[in-house]
Amino acid sequence: MTQVAKKILVTCALPYANGSIHLGHMLEHIQADVWVRYQRMRGHEVNFICADDAHGTPIMLKAQQLGITPEQMIGEMSQEHQTDFAGFNISYDNYHSTHSEENRQLSELIYSRLKENGFIKNRTISQLYDPEKGMFLPDRFVKGTCPKCKSPDQYGDNCEVCGATYSPTELIEPKSVVSGATPVMRDSEHFFFDLPSFSEMLQAWTRSGALQEQVANKMQEWFESGLQQWDISRDAPYFGFEIPNAPGKYFYVWLDAPIGYMGSFKNLCDKRGDSVSFDEYWKKDSTAELYHFIGKDIVYFHSLFWPAMLEGSNFRKPTNLFVHGYVTVNGAKMSKSRGTFIKASTWLNHFDADSLRYYYTAKLSSRIDDIDLNLEDFVQRVNADIVNKVVNLASRNAGFINKRFDGVLASELADPQLYKTFTDAAEVIGEAWESREFGKAVREIMALADLANRYVDEQAPWVVAKQEGRDADLQAICSMGINLFRVLMTYLKPVLPKLTERAEAFLNTELTWDGIQQPLLGHKVNPFKALYNRIDMKQVEALVEASKEEVKATTAPVTGPLADDPIQETITFDDFAKVDLRVALIENAEFVEGSDKLLRLTLDLGGEKRNVFSGIRSAYPDPQALIGRHTIMVANLAPRKMRFGISEGMVMAAGPGGKDIFLLSPDAGAKPGHQVK
């Protein structure tokens, strides 16, 4: 039965733009995509969006380490993420970035509305500061012992063990993640969102019955503990959006990250030339539905701060949050050393996307339970279910239809009651997809697959094919098998997009939810081609080994000059400005009697002569070759008395030593006495 079409906006949590997509990420994106594909099959108007979370200190620091700009890094990472999601056939309508003009404008709009409505408070706070790096430390760059449950090695904003949130100043024995130094306290003026003002609204939203029971129970614990004002600002240096009329202050990444949902949708509307839909979906009284698929680690932000921000800025709240658990591999946390910390791209080098989509789907429910990817069970389940039960149903019937009946199916069903059993299951299976009871849906479908294969086994078309005068029976039996295959693939279409494409090509028809009510009668199918290949443990072993090799490549010791001679501690610009570097002409160069390391250089600074002893003899056995060259010297270095005389400066050279010392020279045109700036 056709449903009334709904307008639905679906989002996944925004992947952080400083690392690759891995199988933990993929659980959420697959779960959301299966649900979205089902909604589309039922005729609903679905907009499915995501974006990269592209702001924050981690982005800034990693870009510095790579020697590139944050903009360049997040641009490259966005392309990588989108390639991975496309490889898994995640059907996004738009994939954007929080570092966008749409997101800037919306962040400033929401902030200004909150401020106008009295929900932004200013106050001076004491904040952790890294004395070695000269920067305030964001929450995730401080680690210590959780003040609530006393678990060690927890971040400065929330505990991954007990789920508590707190200020980084509350950590026990905090350490800077950047330098390892013990942070010191410094004062800074910050901006706070007045979350407690929304306590009554949030409690009513929690009691509405829409949220998962586990989420509602956790929120009740937070209400009982009392809501706190939320610090939404960070001090420079910071990669993000500067707060209007507050120089040197930036929006905290968790303020503009969820606004990224709105920014990505706004970008999609603009691409379509659709100026109406944005307001239609986000206005206060919107009748469109809004769903966020998220992991259990970010429930606090999405269940408290996000709806409160929307309420306070006169936008609509989410219809619901769909929260999932973590992914373990072979019963344990994903491990780089064991090769079970597997990137999405690595998986696709060894297996197809449909295999993981099916395995995750078969294990998912509407509860917030962790999902274990047992790699041996994965191989057995994919082969048993997809290959043996579903694909084999088509292959064992298609041969007879193609060879004996030119691909034409029978004009009547051999067993109408069995077919009705299959189509009647649409209600139960559809409800399971709708309610995210994916494991139940798969169990129902596989039970039908068992019925279909039992029918074929009992009818034994391979026996009938050898009996004279039974061509009509053979055609009817095999046509029945192919029609049952069609129903099964229709139910599995949200899960297996690539297998569905191949099945539709064979069946010579599109698979639609309502279409299965009418069987394919007198219909011509195409020649059968292999739809899916079996997988084996050798592929798993290769996958694990490849993951280990990737870890070795990314964690291998640094080689080259920096490994043996690392960069010194950071100095300030004022420190650097004290060094006066000048261009000098080498007027004379000679050996120093009694030294096997030094050369005596006479340097012209453009009106002033200097005598400098330099330890470069091993690289320049013929001092005369240096005469007439220009070099760089430290002109304001205090004279140093040596047993050979007084050295009045230092020339600049590079290299590890010995014969590999290279005197630095300025570009052509530089004159003696010119200052190096």
Curated annotation (Swiss-Prot):
Look up the EC number in the record and give it.
Answer: 6.1.1.10
Entry GO CC: cytosol
Instruction: Quote the record's cofactor note.
Output: Binds 1 zinc ion per subunit.
Domain tRNA-binding intervals:
575-677
GO MF annotation list: ATP binding; metal ion binding; methionine-tRNA ligase activity; tRNA binding
Broad class of enzyme this protein falls into: ligase
GO biological process: one example: methionyl-tRNA aminoacylation
The residues listed in the UniProt record as binding Zn(2+), with positions renumbered to this chain, are C146, C149, C159, C162
Q: Where in the cell is it found?
A: Cytoplasm
* InterPro entries per record: aa-tRNA-synth_I_CS, Anticodon_Met, Met-tRNA-synth_bsu_C, Met-tRNA_ligase_1, Met-tRNA_synth, Methionyl/Leucyl_tRNA_Synth, MetRS_core, MetRS_Zn
Keyword annotations: Aminoacyl-tRNA synthetase, ATP-binding, Cytoplasm, Ligase, Metal-binding, Nucleotide-binding, Protein biosynthesis, RNA-binding, tRNA-binding, Zinc
Keyword tRNA-binding annotated: yes
Per the record's keyword annotation, is Lipid biosynthesis included, yes or no? Answer: no
In terms of domain of life, where is this protein from?
Answer: Bacteria
Task: List the Pfam families.
Answer: Anticodon_3, tRNA-synt_1g, tRNA_bind
Write out the catalysed reaction: tRNA(Met) + L-methionine + ATP = L-methionyl-tRNA(Met) + AMP + diphosphate
Q: Which residues form a coiled coil?
A: none
User: Where is motif 'KMSKS' region found?
Assistant: 333-337
> From the record, which residues define motif 'HIGH' region?
15-25
Question: What family does the database annotate?
Answer: Belongs to the class-I aminoacyl-tRNA synthetase family. MetG type 1 subfamily.
Under the subunit heading, UniProt states: Homodimer.
**Summary of the function given for this chain in its UniProt record:** Is required not only for elongation of protein synthesis but also for the initiation of all mRNA translation through initiator tRNA(fMet) aminoacylation.
Question: How is this protein named in the record?
Answer: Methionine--tRNA ligase
- In its UniProt entry, the species of origin is given as Escherichia fergusonii (strain ATCC 35469 / DSM 13698 / CCUG 18766 / IAM 14443 / JCM 21226 / LMG 7866 / NBRC 102419 / NCTC 12128 / CDC 0568-73)
